Amino acid sequence: MTTIVSVRRDGKVAMGGDGQVSLGNTVMKGNARKVRRLYHNKVIAGFAGGTADAFTLFERFEAQLEKHQGNLVRAAVELAKDWRTDRALRRLEALLAVADNKASLIITGNGDVIEPENSLIAIGSGGPYAQAAARALLENTELEASDIVKKSLVIAGDICVFTNQNLTLEEIDGTQTPSTV
């Protein structure tokens, strides 16, 4: 599995993920890029679950973003509908975390589109550890979103055997295009 974390603070949204790909109890790859930019660099997305499944979902989600002129919520709802009703897509096992400068969402294969409390997303096997860390940092520090994401992923990587510390971080600052952190 993996860990993906997204935090929104002070007009910025950051998302990061680890790089571990596991097959059963074996680490197959340590430097996978599970967080990427979509739709003209205006959206960041991360996945937890099967790698091949996630790439299929990224393609479908980006097509929905194009179809709906970058409207994140509309694209997420349409992807969730397709995911739930399409026989081939229903077999895909992954979760998507997506964010733009206005919204942060989790998209599931059950047809759910969830806007989390406090714009904090943490998915994957290390998600609960990263969520607890990010929440504590949000409530008790003035750290920037990208720093909270990084520290949360490091903590999750220390605890979860399916999460490493080879991190990919992306950030969107207001209406600017995302930058690699």
From Swiss-Prot:
What the entry lists under InterPro entries is as follows:
ATP-dep_Prtase_HsIV_su (IPR022281), Ntn_hydrolases_N (IPR029055), Proteasome_sua/b (IPR001353), Proteasome_suB-type (IPR023333)
Key words of the record: Allosteric enzyme, Cytoplasm, Hydrolase, Metal-binding, Protease, Sodium, Threonine protease
Biological process (GO) annotations held by this record are: proteolysis involved in protein catabolic process
What EC number(s) does its UniProt record assign? 3.4.25.2
Cellular component, GO annotation: HslUV protease complex; proteasome core complex
Question: Does Hydrolase count among this protein's keywords?
Answer: yes
- Indicate which residues the UniProt annotation says bind Na(+): 157, 160, 163
Q: Which GO terms describe its molecular function?
A: metal ion binding; threonine-type endopeptidase activity
Protein's name in the database: ATP-dependent protease subunit HslV
Assembly behavior: A double ring-shaped homohexamer of HslV is capped on each side by a ring-shaped HslU homohexamer. The assembly of the HslU/HslV complex is dependent on binding of ATP.
Q: Which domain of life is it from?
A: Bacteria
Can you state which reaction this protein catalyses?
ATP-dependent cleavage of peptide bonds with broad specificity
The active site consists of 2
Q: What is the lineage of its organism?
A: Bacteria, Pseudomonadati, Pseudomonadota, Gammaproteobacteria, Oceanospirillales
Q: What does this protein do?
A: Protease subunit of a proteasome-like degradation complex believed to be a general protein degrading machinery.
Q: What class of enzyme is it?
A: hydrolase
